[in-house]
């Protein structure tokens, strides 16, 4: 059975659309993985504990929040900035609110600017390490514990950093079957 040129073209176009759809679905997790592995685009380090050394020099850390188009949550930092000593542990909070009538899951991608600070900005604990699930009308405060590594002062570019911006963008993710079943059960219980 031979395909006509029109059928081959239509089949090729369907394949292109399917590949593009699959690539867009996988883009956020792949980008997060790529940035963590390479340190690209100011991706931060992950640490288990703060350094023993705390310097007298301070750095101002600013906090930024945004949402991917279509993400229905409200999302914001609870403080705009803080100043801390290099090596000192900082604790900041972000707030997320789900104003919809459905359960919504999301993950946060993150980066630090300037890029020279990315490898020296370390998170000990962060809401961005796991998926967040908010029920309808739920509001949560989400912490991030971090520090700026004292090694930054030995870096030819990093030593001039006086201000760092930590940015998060929340992306909606599909609910797992278990989460969707719990959400449906909760909605049924209300009615």
Curated annotation (Swiss-Prot):
One GO biological process term is: respiratory chain complex IV assembly
Q: Cytoplasmic side of the membrane: what ranges?
A: 1-9
Mark the transmembrane ranges. Answer: 10-30
Quote the cellular component terms of the Gene Ontology held in the record: plasma membrane
Tell me the GO molecular function terms: copper ion binding
Which UniProt keywords are listed?
Answer: Cell inner membrane, Cell membrane, Copper, Membrane, Signal-anchor, Transmembrane, Transmembrane helix
- Describe its membrane topology: Single-pass type II membrane protein
Q: Where is the major localization of this protein?
A: membrane
Residues on Periplasmic side: 31-191
Which SUPFAM superfamilies does the annotation name?
Ctag/Cox11
The domain of life for this entry's organism is Bacteria
List all disulphide bridges recorded for this chain. none
Annotated localization: Cell inner membrane
What family does the Swiss-Prot or TrEMBL record give for this protein?
Answer: Belongs to the COX11/CtaG family.
Q: PANTHER family under this entry?
A: CYTOCHROME C OXIDASE ASSEMBLY PROTEIN COX11, MITOCHONDRIAL-RELATED (PTHR21320:SF3), CYTOCHROME C OXIDASE ASSEMBLY PROTEIN COX11-RELATED (PTHR21320)
Question: What is known about what this protein does?
Answer: Exerts its effect at some terminal stage of cytochrome c oxidase synthesis, probably by being involved in the insertion of the copper B into subunit I.
User: What's this protein's name?
Assistant: Cytochrome c oxidase assembly protein CtaG
Q: Which organism is it from?
A: Cereibacter sphaeroides (strain ATCC 17029 / ATH 2.4.9) (Rhodobacter sphaeroides)
The taxonomic lineage of its organism, from the top, reads: Bacteria, Pseudomonadati, Pseudomonadota, Alphaproteobacteria, Rhodobacterales
């Amino acid at each position: 059975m031979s395909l006509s040129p029109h059928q081959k073209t239509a089949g090729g176009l369907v394949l292109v659309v399917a590949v593009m759809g699959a690539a867009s679905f996988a883009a956020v997790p792949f980008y997060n993985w790529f940035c963590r592995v390479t340190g690209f685009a100011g991706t931060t380090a992950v640490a288990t504990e703060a350094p023993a050394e705390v310097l007298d020099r301070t750095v101002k850390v600013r906090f930024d929040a945004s949402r991917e188009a279509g993400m229905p949550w409200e999302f914001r930092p609870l403080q705009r900035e803080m100043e801390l000593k290099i090596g000192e542990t900082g604790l900041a909070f972000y707030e997320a609110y789900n104003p919809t009538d459905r359960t919504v899951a999301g993950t946060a991608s993150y980066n630090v600017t300037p890029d020279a600070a990315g490898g020296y900005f370390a998170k000990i604990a962060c809401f961005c390490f796991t998926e967040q699930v908010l029920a309808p009308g739920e509001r949560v405060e989400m912490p991030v514990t971090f520090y700026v590594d004292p090694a930054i002062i030995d870096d030819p570019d990093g030593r001039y950093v006086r201000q760092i911006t930590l940015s998060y963008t929340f992306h909606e993710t599909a609910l797992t079957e278990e989460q969707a079943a719990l959400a449906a059960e909760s909605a049924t219980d209300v009615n």
